[in-house]
């Protein structure tokens, strides 16, 4: 199965099972440690993740709130950069050839590696999609084409402030799915206005004909359920990382990784169970 096929297949499985929305957890590669990342990814899949977003640590993460920033800092302090992240994905692929993995990060590490070299390395590692926070779609046609040529989906962000023209532009180049940022500001901030999200998704779907995931501001089962009634996927990161961070801080040094992984799996499973109860509000009767 090729990389872009894995994303389509994941959403198809969700639909065939009659579920309202896919569950996409976000974690920072290398947090709580590089050694824990692959076991953590497998644990998230066991908990019910349909896809996994893997953050590439970067020293100036402008879109990330304090929780995700701390996770990136912990990973960087342990020597995790883009090349190590690709190695971790390849390690994950040895035991899981089904679950899509999407890298989320910033342009600087990719530019240092070179866009074409990165696209080829991502494909070789088994990456399914790439979301670069600070690459505007109007300026990345060539990079998006390189990714697509390598079988890797170029994934883009949309925000509450996105104009219809920008939505239309993203609809032309995005593959896999589109990530709608439900709040203004950084990850982990603010509170959700579900009605506003529903209105924006209706506009997005006029121009975007692939799944639309929603993230930012989803912190518990109730907020995940509200979003799942409208979106094709629920993306959840800050609260998951915070749960691991708090649990790891309470554990002894030799138990920190295991405690964080167990807490993440247990917490995410509660979200998955909640999502399984949701019926899509705009689904046909």
Curated annotation (Swiss-Prot):
The keyword Cytoplasm does not apply. Pfam families: Trp_syntA (PF00290). Transmembrane segments: none annotated. GO terms for molecular function: tryptophan synthase activity. The keyword Oxidoreductase does not apply. It catalyses: (1S,2R)-1-C-(indol-3-yl)glycerol 3-phosphate + L-serine = D-glyceraldehyde 3-phosphate + L-tryptophan + H2O. The active site is at 53 (proton acceptor), 64 (proton acceptor). Its EC number is 4.2.1.20. Keywords: Amino-acid biosynthesis, Aromatic amino acid biosynthesis, Lyase, Tryptophan biosynthesis. Pathway: Amino-acid biosynthesis; L-tryptophan biosynthesis; L-tryptophan from chorismate: step 5/5. One of its GO terms (cellular component) is cytosol. Tetramer of two alpha and two beta chains. The alpha subunit is responsible for the aldol cleavage of indoleglycerol phosphate to indole and glyceraldehyde 3-phosphate. Belongs to the TrpA family. HAMAP family: Trp_synth_alpha. This is Tryptophan synthase alpha chain. It comes from Bordetella parapertussis (strain 12822 / ATCC BAA-587 / NCTC 13253).
């Amino acid at each position: 199965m090729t990389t872009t096929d894995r994303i389509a297949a994941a959403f198809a499985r969700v639909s065939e099972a009659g579920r309202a929305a896919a569950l996409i957890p976000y974690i920072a590669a290398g947090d709580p440690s590089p050694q824990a990342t692959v076991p953590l990814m497998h644990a998230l899949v066991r908990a019910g993740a349909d896809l996994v977003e893997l953050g590439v640590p970067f020293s100036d993460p402008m879109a990330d709130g304090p929780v995700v920033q701390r996770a990136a800092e912990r990973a960087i302090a342990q020597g995790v950069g883009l090349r190590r992240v690709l190695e971790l994905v390849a390690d994950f692929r040895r035991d899981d050839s089904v679950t899509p993995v999407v890298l989320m990060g910033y342009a600087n590490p990719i530019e240092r590696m070179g866009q074409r070299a990165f696209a080829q390395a991502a494909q070789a590692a088994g990456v399914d999609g790439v979301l670069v926070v600070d690459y505007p779609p109007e300026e990345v046609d060539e990079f998006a084409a390189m990714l697509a040529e390598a079988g890797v989906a170029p994934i883009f962000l949309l925000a509450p402030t996105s104009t219809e023209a920008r939505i239309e532009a993203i609809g032309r180049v995005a593959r896999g799915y589109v990530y709608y940022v439900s709040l203004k500001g950084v990850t982990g901030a603010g509170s959700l206005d579900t009605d506003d999200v529903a209105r924006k998704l209706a506009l997005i779907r006029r121009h975007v004909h692939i799944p639309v995931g929603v993230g930012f501001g989803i912190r518990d089962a109730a907020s995940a359920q509200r979003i799942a009634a409208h979106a094709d996927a629920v993306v959840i990161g800050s609260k998951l990382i915070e749960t691991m961070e708090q649990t790891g801080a309470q554990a002894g040094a030799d138990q920190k990784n295991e405690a964080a992984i167990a807490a993440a799996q247990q917490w995410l499973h509660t979200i998955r169970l909640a999502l399984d109860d949701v019926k899509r509000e705009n689904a046909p009767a």
